């Protein structure tokens, strides 16, 4: 059985926040932010727009694109670090709101790697034969856990959601290989500070880790699929920082024109980052049926995940 993406949807909030916004209260500038991160703007959810609201919008699109009814979804997995509540989960809230039956629903926490982890979990459940259509959502409202007094991180984060329906696809398409991993010794470099409930990041250490692991994981995933860099049509890295992304691309040996870049529009949206990029490339006609995609992310934990897939239902 070949398992992959049967339906896709993405959602970004309406509010656009440009770099100049930060100039009034931080020692920074539009030019500096653009040069150091590649970010020009990001989207922030409104105060009354919760993580589950964004997940709902993306999910509706994914279910419609899959050509199924919501009632045909038999499991929900939501990758997020910013649930509406500690519990119930976003998946529970989403299940009720979508009108789906009493199916298995769970949130998965792997920070910015969460979408990769959740996709692979869904793949295994479908291949077991017990499930047919699993809704996987990557969503985060990072604006609510951003420390706006910290110049190094305040400028980075945005909000958004992406959703896919994972199920059986045509022969030769779908998820070809994957690589998942974690290193708990690096947990101290990126975490939610319990004192203020905001993100803390040791940028220097995270940068060194990300540059190395994104390249390694991508190369390993491609090799596991018995492919080479020349076979890759689109490289979709976690949109954390353009310099990290470029380093990973170079290590994989992918030409610049084959890398998806949406960090300039959305900033770092954690678990939503990769699906938002996929959505952008679909809109631009840069992803077509039977294209080989490499998706790779890293995040707090420290965690990482890479997936090689052949696009198409």
Swiss-Prot record:
It catalyses: malonyl-[ACP] + acetyl-CoA + H(+) = 3-oxobutanoyl-[ACP] + CO2 + CoA. Signal peptide: none annotated. Its EC number is 2.3.1.180. GO terms for biological process: fatty acid biosynthetic process. The active site is at 112, 238, 268. Pfam families: ACP_syn_III, ACP_syn_III_C. Pathway: Lipid metabolism; fatty acid biosynthesis. This is Beta-ketoacyl-[acyl-carrier-protein] synthase III. The gene is fabH.
């Amino acid at each position: 059985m070949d398992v992959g993406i049967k339906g896709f949807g993405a959602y970004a909030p309406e509010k656009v926040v440009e770099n100049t916004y930060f100039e009034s209260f931080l020692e920074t500038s539009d030019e500096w932010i653009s040069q150091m991160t590649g970010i020009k703007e990001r989207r922030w959810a409104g105060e009354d727009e919760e993580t589950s609201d964004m997940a709902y919008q993306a999910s509706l699109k994914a279910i419609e694109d899959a050509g199924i009814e919501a009632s045909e979804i038999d499991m929900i997995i939501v990758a997020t670090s910013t649930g509406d509540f500690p519990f119930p989960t976003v998946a529970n809230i989403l299940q009720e709101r979508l009108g789906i039956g009493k199916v298995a629903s769970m949130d998965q926490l792997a920070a910015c790697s969460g979408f990769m982890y959740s996709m692979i979990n869904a793949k295994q459940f479908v291949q077991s034969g017990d499930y047919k259509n699993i809704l996987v959502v990557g969503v985060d409202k990072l604006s609510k856990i951003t420390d706006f007094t910290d110049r190094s991180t305040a400028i980075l984060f945005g909000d958004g959601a992406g959703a896919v329906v994972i199920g059986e696809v045509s022969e030769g398409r779908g998820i070809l290989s994957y690589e998942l991993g974690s290193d708990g010794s690096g947990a101290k470099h990126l975490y939610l500070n319990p004192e203020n409930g905001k993100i803390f990041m040791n940028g220097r250490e995270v940068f060194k880790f990300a540059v190395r692991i994104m390249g390694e994981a991508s190369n390993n995933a491609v090799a596991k699929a018995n492919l080479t860099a020349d076979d890759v049509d689109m490289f979709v890295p976690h949109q954390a920082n353009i310099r990290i992304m470029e380093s990973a691309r170079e290590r994989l040996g992918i030409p610049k024109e084959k890398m998806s870049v949406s960090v300039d529009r959305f900033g770092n949206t954690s678990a939503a980052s990769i699906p938002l990029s996929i959505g952008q490339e679909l809109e631009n006609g840069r992803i077509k049926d039977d294209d080989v995609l490499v998706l790779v992310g890293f995040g707090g934990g420290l965690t990482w995940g890479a997936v090689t897939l052949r696009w198409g239902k």
